[in-house]
Amino acid sequence: MDQDLQEPEGGLTPHLTIRDRRAVDAIDFYRQAFGADEVMRHPAEDGRLMHAHLKINGASLMLHDDFPEHHGARASDPAGVMLHLQVDDADAWWNRAVAMGATVIMELADQFWGDRYGQLEDPFGHRWSIGAPIARN
């Protein structure tokens, strides 16, 4: 694979730890719910996923299974972390994510700041917000 294609895009790349050896399931969910493209994956010898790089909505997202034996951070309940998707059609992105099993935290609705916005939790415990400018007539 071309090394340039594997480079993260954007100035900040979230790197998620997925509990319970479910990183491969998370890739499938992000592909179906958020239209993720898989750039690469690197499995560990024991079958866990050591590293994966996805692209969602033009930005990079990296993830891996939990590796506590390497003294990495144990996946905890996310506190204060929200992954935001700014899109053209919030309803389409929202409906696809909910259909794939995301849990609604804050209903998608028109907000005072001018976006249609809502919050979801994916099946792996990570919180996402989806927003799009409210269409003006």
Feature-to-residue mapping (PLM):
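Conserved beta-strand-loop-alpha-helix junction that forms the acyl-donor binding cleft
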Residues: R21-R22
